[in-house]
């Protein structure tokens, strides 16, 4: 064929003509570019079966493992040496030896997961839960959901009073604990009874002074949450909110300001709770004449505080930034699931902690032996491995003691030295304090002490011990790890049948709240029952003082003896709860003895403050939509009489042993003046001044002088 030479295509450097082919000349088939599919493309499609490795319930890593499992199975077993086989047998025997350390059927802390196919890298050592907390899973009660009678049929404690607001009260107390750096010291020692009395949910049997103090604290809590909710972005990182104390709150003329009106305008946008959806004007009377929470019904008060916590978590810049920080911490919780969790020593007992520590040391020593067999070239690494193995050898010898108290002392001592040898191996051990690391802070159930399958959950919120003259708030002292371990040693040394709380003096009261939640019935009603969830009680009080606590312990002992199977999870949960409550009884007895031996001072009662009777010395504004809360000392007119000063500060002076002369002085004044002066105290500013005077500005000099002259006339 004749070739056609195109002179325009000649290369300038080589001077060699290039051949240009004609259109009808044969060439290579053109490859189609990627684009829209045509019918020709569909003709080439072949139908194949779905591969096993691409199942919907497996992740990418699981699919890759399944694909390579068959190809590497023969190579894996052929390359296994005799020494590694011995290691596998030792780990399997160890798993059967310590198989009793699991608490629930679905707990991640199961040593039985060590199988015969464990490789030499000791993967189960990192997958098991060695943290001081254990997760609270739904699967703990899942197998009981098919039963109509979820709870044990013989579960009938001597005291089981329905307490529908218990969950909301513990939510408030838990929120204060998690974000205690923004609240004042007056709110950090709140107990369950303080919230219950301050919101008038239960006021029977309490003095007028105690009721009024609790009411002031609840108004302080509401005002603090209101200020934090509308905190600006500039002040989001400022920790000056702790300066908003109870004394400062009571001295302000209008502590709420425009914040209540702003809350009313946004509540429709944020959404109402289900209890208020039939009455959208529930907040119309809030802060009427400066009354705060006391202008609402008792049940509406607890609902409002619960909603304030939810709104702060969602819309407050201060709490939003803190939650963002706590949820993005570097570290591992140990169980790799974002769920609620509770402390191990309360839920499982000391024996579980000691067994877990022993298993951890055994597996860690085996891992170090495998490292040593690889003969590291660096002499520094070899010496480090030898020192670690020597330390673990002494640890295992100490934990092999038969006496539980000796094992516990050894475990505490070992935990102090653990970080020096294994700083990069594990971040947590079972004997650690569960409240130290911030990674557990956000989802910790602080007051939970037991979970019993087929029965439910048990909580011990903050309480106080004392009498009218002196009281000690034991809010969080017993839940401390070191405190619990010290009393556990005393309990083991003194005997297991000690119930000293019954022999305590009658004048020293222990007003605790042991709360029981029927969790199995709660889950079942949420899933299968058509009955309205709020109409069925799920929260109960099973102990309210020392005597009822002793009766409940005796009932649990009789209930535990009915179960013949010692391996049952229900029996294990009951035994752990009995042990915890007996140790708690020793703590109560020693605290009461310490209060009885301490000298007490005389204090005076205070008048009850209700929605219709408010003190004159705190100048609440009648204008709800007034100026924003005034906190400057030169702008606020603080006119506090000597009677009120001694009356309010009597509790603080008793605790600090100061101001006794002031208390005696006020007591003498009240003896001289009879009912005439007491009636005048109950008058408000609105009743004192006429309408033209009330129309003046609150900050005007003329109105302040008229106010002072009017009180002098009274």
UniProtKB/Swiss-Prot annotation:
Provide the alphabetized UniProt keywords: Cytoplasm, Nucleus, Repressor, Transcription, Transcription regulation
Q: Using the record for this protein, list the coiled-coil segments as residue ranges, or answer none.
A: none
The annotated regions of Basic residues compositional bias extend over 704-714
Q: Where in the cell is it found?
A: Cytoplasm; Nucleus
Name one cellular component (GO) term. cytoplasm
Q: Does the keyword Transport apply?
A: no
| GO biological process per UniProt | heterochromatin formation; sister chromatid cohesion
Please note every region of biased composition (Polar residues): 610-624
Q: Where is the composition biased (Basic and acidic residues)?
A: 654-674
Q: Where is this region: Disordered?
A: 598-674, 694-714
Top-level taxon of origin: Eukaryota
Q: Where is the composition biased (Acidic residues)?
A: 628-650
Oligomer and partners: Interacts with GAL11 and SIR2.
Additional remark text? Present with 432 molecules/cell in log phase SD medium.
**What function does the entry list?**
Involved in HMR and telomere silencing via the recruitment or stabilizing of the SIR (silent information regulators) complex.
Name of the protein: Protein ESC8
Q: Which organism is it from?
A: Saccharomyces cerevisiae (strain ATCC 204508 / S288c) (Baker's yeast)
């Amino acid at each position: 064929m004749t070739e056609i030479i195109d002179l325009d295509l000649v290369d300038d450097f080589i001077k060699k003509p290039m051949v240009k082919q004609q259109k009808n000349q044969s060439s290579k088939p053109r490859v189609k570019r990627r684009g829209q599919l045509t019918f020709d493309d569909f003709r080439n499609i072949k139908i194949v079966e779905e591969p096993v490795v691409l199942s919907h319930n497996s992740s990418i890593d699981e699919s890759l493992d399944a694909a390579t499992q068959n190809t590497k199975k023969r190579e894996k077993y052929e390359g296994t040496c005799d020494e590694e086989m011995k290691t596998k047998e030792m780990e399997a025997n160890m798993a059967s030896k310590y198989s009793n350390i699991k608490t629930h059927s679905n707990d991640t802390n199961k040593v039985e997961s060590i199988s015969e196919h464990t490789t030499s890298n000791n993967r189960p050592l990192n997958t098991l839960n060695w943290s001081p907390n254990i997760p609270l899973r739904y699967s703990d009660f899942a197998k009981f959901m098919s039963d109509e009678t979820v709870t044990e049929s013989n579960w009938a404690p001597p005291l089981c009073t329905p307490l529908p607001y218990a969950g909301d009260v513990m939510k408030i107390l838990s929120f204060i604990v998690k974000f205690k750096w923004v609240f004042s010291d007056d709110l950090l020692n709140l107990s369950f009874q303080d919230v219950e009395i301050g919101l008038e949910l239960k006021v029977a049997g309490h003095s007028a002074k105690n009721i009024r103090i609790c009411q002031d604290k609840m108004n302080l809590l509401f005002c603090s949450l209101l200020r934090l909710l509308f905190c600006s972005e500039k002040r989001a990182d400022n920790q000056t909110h702790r300066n908003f104390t109870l004394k400062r709150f009571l001295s302000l003329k209008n502590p709420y300001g425009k914040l209540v009106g702003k809350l009313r305008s946004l509540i429709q946008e944020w959404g109402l709770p289900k209890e208020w959806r039939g009455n959208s004007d529930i907040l119309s009377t809030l802060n009427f004449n400066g009354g705060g929470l006391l202008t609402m019904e008792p049940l509406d008060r607890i609902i409002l505080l619960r909603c304030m916590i939810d709104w702060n978590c969602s819309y407050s810049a201060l709490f939003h930034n803190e939650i963002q920080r706590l949820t993005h911490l570097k570290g591992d919780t140990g169980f790799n699931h974002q769920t609620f969790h509770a402390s191990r020593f309360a839920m499982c007992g000391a024996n579980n902690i000691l067994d877990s520590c022993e298993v951890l040391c055994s597996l860690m020593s085996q891992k170090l032996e495998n490292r040593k067999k690889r003969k590291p070239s660096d002499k520094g690494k070899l010496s480090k491995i030898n020192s670690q193995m020597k330390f673990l050898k002494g640890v295992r010898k100490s934990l092999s003691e038969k006496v539980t108290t000796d094992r516990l002392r050894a475990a505490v001592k070992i935990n102090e030295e653990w970080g020096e040898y294994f700083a990069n191996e594990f971040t947590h051990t079972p004997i650690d304090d569960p409240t130290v690391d911030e990674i557990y802070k956000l989802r910790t159930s602080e007051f939970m002490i037991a979970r019993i399958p087929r029965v439910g959950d048990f909580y011990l919120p903050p309480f106080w011990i004392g009498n009218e003259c002196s009281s000690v708030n034991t809010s969080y002292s017993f839940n401390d790890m070191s405190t619990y371990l010290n009393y556990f040693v005393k309990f083991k040394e003194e005997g297991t049948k000690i119930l000293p709380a019954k022999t305590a003096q009658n004048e020293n009261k222990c007003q605790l709240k042991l709360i029981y939640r029927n969790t199995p019935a709660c889950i079942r009603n949420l899933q299968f029952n058509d009955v309205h969830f709020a109409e069925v009680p799920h929260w109960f009080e099973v102990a309210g003082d020392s005597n009822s606590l002793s009766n409940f312990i005796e009932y649990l002992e009789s209930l535990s003896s009915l179960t013949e199977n010692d391996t049952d999870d229900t029996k294990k949960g009951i035994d752990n709860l009995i042990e915890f409550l007996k140790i708690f009884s020793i703590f109560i007895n020693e605290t009461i003895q310490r209060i009885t031996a301490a000298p007490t001072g005389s204090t005076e009662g205070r008048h009850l403050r209700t929605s219709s009777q408010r003190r004159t010395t705190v100048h609440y504004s009648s204008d709800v939509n007034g100026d924003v809360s005034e906190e400057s000392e030169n702008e606020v007119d603080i006119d506090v009489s000597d009677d009120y000063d001694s009356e309010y500060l009597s509790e603080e002076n008793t605790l600090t042993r100061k101001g006794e002369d002031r208390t005696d002085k006020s007591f003498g004044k009240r003896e001289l003046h009879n009912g005439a002066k007491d009636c005048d105290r109950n008058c408000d500013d609105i009743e004192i001044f006429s309408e033209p005077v009330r129309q003046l500005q609150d900050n005007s000099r003329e109105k302040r002088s008229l106010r002072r002259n009017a009180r002098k006339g009274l």
